[in-house]
Amino acid sequence: VGSEMCIRDRVKAIAPTFGGINLEDIKAPECFEIERRLKEELDIPVMHDDQHGTAIISSAGLVNALQVAGKKIEDVKIVVNGAGASAVSCTKLYVSLGARLENIVMLDSKGVISKTRTDLNEQKRYFATDRTDIHTLEEAIKGADVFLGLSKGNVLSQDMVRSMAPMPIVFALANPTPEISYEDAMAARPDVLMATGRSDYPNQINNVIGFPYIFRGALDTQAKAINEEMKIAAVHAIANLAKQPVPDVVNAAYHVNNLSFGAEYFIPKPVDPRLITEVSCAVAK
């Protein structure tokens, strides 16, 4: 509690000199209360990037990966490995976009988060499943359409990927070592649609694609907060940008001839100069 108050007091002390504040590297569950209180007490936008930046970019990736796979978000089964700030916020935004709570299974270090457990905080209770037939990641992932990993490296095996539904979506976002390597996932099955947090593989989920331009849109309109509608607008702006022809400067930066929307490119690159106008304008509206 003392450290939470210290962070809040320091942020409030500097707030009058800034138009917005981006919070970074505050662990769960403290981050939820710190952000909530600051949003209540300040009249400028406050956003915890580890939560909402990751959520927005991964949601844009999910929207597009589902299109490539020919699936609808309200129908897919989603397994989330990790229950920290990023995982919780990503999953909440997936729900805002149409994912159904009953189709989501979340796991923490103790296994499946179920309603039978008595050790859950408020954030975890929201995602607790009624299912009693699954306890481990290996059991939960069978037949799943989507895997979101925000946990630790090398916890997702090739056999687990093979047990997923056709054209599985695998977002292995642990850094620097993902839950499964790009090479191992592709070797397990060629139809996997994969994203990581790394720049040396296709479809990097990188917060820098979002937060600078989200704040630009909020500042341009003198918004007092970044609300759910603004986040969803950013999701769709980023997702739509990946479907447009890619500028030569982006192709050149990645030493490719012609990036185009599909399995290996469904998230815009961080160097794309169109992000500032597309995302900030969408947020401002």
Could you describe each region identified by the protein language model?
Residues 49-50, 69, 172-284:
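Adenosine-phosphate binding glycine-rich loop
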Residues 10-53:
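Phosphate/diphosphate ligand-binding glycine-rich loop within oxidoreductases
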Residues 133-190, 222:
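Long hydrophobic segments that form regular secondary structure
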Residues 1-7:
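Short, small-residue-biased leader/transition segments that mark boundaries at the very start
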